[in-house]
Every structure is written in C-alpha cells, then in structure tokens.
Amino acid sequence: MTASSSASTCARPLAAPMPRLNFQAVAPELYKAQAGINALLHESSLGIQLLELVFLRVSQINGCAFCVDMHTRELLSRGEDLQRINSIVTWPEVDFYDGRERAALNWAERCTRLSQAHPEQQDFEALRPHFSEREMVELTYAIGSINVWNRLCAGFAAPVARKPIKL
C-alpha cells in the first residue's frame, strides 16, 4: 500500500460493522430464555436504576461496546445524572453513589473479575446491610446475566450505531 492509497483509505467513512453472527436468529429459544431472566430481574425489588448501574459497570469491565451504549442510553432515558453515569468507572473514588449502590457495584466487580480473585467474605458482608438474601441472589443473577449478554454481544460483534445522545 502506498502512502497516497493509505491516506485515501483513512479518509473514507467506514461502513457500519456487521455482526459475526445473529445469535438471536440462530438460537431464538436460548435468546428468549435469557431475555426471560432479565424480565424477571426487572420485576425484582432491586430497582431498575440499580440494575442498570450494575449492567453498565459490568459491561465496561468486559469491554462490550454494544452493552455500554445500551445501558448508558437506558440510564439517561430514566433520568440518571450524566455525572454519575460518566463516573461509574471510578465509583470507589467519588461519593456520588449511596451505600446500597456501592455494595452492589463492588459485588458486581468481584463476581465479574473471577480470574483475578473470587469475592471475599468481606464483600459478601458488605451486602447484608443493604440487601435481603433474596435480593443478594437476584443481584448475583443480574451480574451473571449481564456477563452472558456481554459475551454474546462482544463475541458475535453486535454493532453499535452512531446515534448522538441529546441531553
């Protein structure tokens, strides 16, 4: 490739990426079952706002562009503060999150980064003041569920369309 052909290639707009595979179409029964878990979680007492914060943080950790975009948009549509959304990547360093959110985000990180270290007893104990046993199970299912979605969307290259967010 010559310098001039390289420059012209870089100047062209890139085509929208295509998914490697449409997992929803290939295995609709599995997709439906996974979506059913999310529907149940949205009916839980955890609250959609907390779920979406957890979904966003786990998606950031896993590097799933599709899911980060989707959960950012969902939080904005539900009135979440932009500063809290932008700061979730550094949640331990800021005081924008209450004790319940901090415990959930910590648990989400520990349960997502299992290859680094498993959740410790102190991480579990930090949940107790904020969550019932049922809610702890629901939270852990939510973390597992978003990890599945991240692997599906990142693994099969779910495309992210450029859609500016209007604030």
Regions found by a protein language model. Give the residues of each.
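Hydrophobic alpha-helical segments
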Residues: 1-167
